[in-house]
Every structure is written in C-alpha cells, then in structure tokens.
Curated annotation (Swiss-Prot):
Swiss-Prot/TrEMBL keywords: ATP-binding, Cytoplasm, Kinase, Nucleotide-binding, Transferase
Identification of the protein by name: Guanylate kinase
Membrane-spanning parts: none
GO MF term list: ATP binding; guanylate kinase activity
Amino acid sequence: MTNYNGLIVITGPSGVGKGTLVKKLLLENPEIWLSISATTRTPREGEINGKDYFFLNKKEFIDLVDKEGFLEWAEFAGNFYGTPRAQAQEKISVGKKVLLEIELDGARQVRKTFPEGFQIFIAPPSFEELEKRIRTRGTDSELAIQSRLNRAKEELLAKNEFDAIVINDQLDIALLEIKKLIKS
C-alpha cells in the first residue's frame, strides 16, 4: 500500500503505452478523476470547454501562472498548456484520487508544487521494443521518430526520480501493478 495524498502522476516516454494504461485504469476505477488541462489553443471541432480542456486566452493563462494557479505548465507550439491547481485540490479535499498523465518536465514541476503526490514512471521492456512500438504506429516521419527516440533516451535516464517504475511489457500485468501501487 502506498501512502500519498490523492494525487497520482503517470509519465514515461512517447510510445510506452501511458494513454492505453490510463484509459483502462479509468474504465476499471471510475472513482479516479482524470485532471482536465487548460490550454490557450483554439478548440478543435467537437471539443467542449470544461470536458476536453479548459480553453483560456493568453492573458487568463498568464494571470493563473502569476497566481501559482497551475501544478505544472508549459508552452508548446506557440500555445500554453497546464494543470489547474484548484480543480485538483478540490477533488482531493473531498477524498477523490486525481490522476495526471503528463510529460517528464511537467512531472518534475508537480514534484516541486505538490511533493506529496505519488509519481509513477512507465518504462518499456527495452529501448528496442519502444522503437518498434513507435515505428509500428505508422503516424510519424523518420525525423519525428528520431526526435521521439532521442527524447525517450533522456526520459529513461530520469526514471529513478519517480516513486515507482512500472515496466509495460504486458499491458494487463502493468495495469495490475499500477492498481496495486495506488490502492489505499
């Protein structure tokens, strides 16, 4: 059993299966609340404010940054993205588990702003397997694949910064391990 204050962070390199694990975890554990990110990007067709993202203008976003209103935030491709602190703290205060699926830099920020959270690093069984997974997606150019692989090398070096490491070799076993780690 793990002792933490309701905040669960899941991170790991691209292609490791974070998204699939999180979807299965949420399906089997509806009491866990997946944090909704804020962004300054324009909503895509069908996206709903407050469900898919909290859509803010840049001034609103920067005001929240200045007021320490985010557990973590970053700028990507000219837009800001962040995890609002108030919504996570509100859910935790009523006993809910809050899950963040974020990148390494975001996880490091959360460690500073919410050190009592529990952080899990999802790792591949090997770097070769990770490369195979990324390549078989068939969605990226060779340049994008190389970029993802270079970033993955850096991220894998950081795995010991986390409270737990789960190797995603077999999805069901990795999922079971995550459930054991966050059981309270």
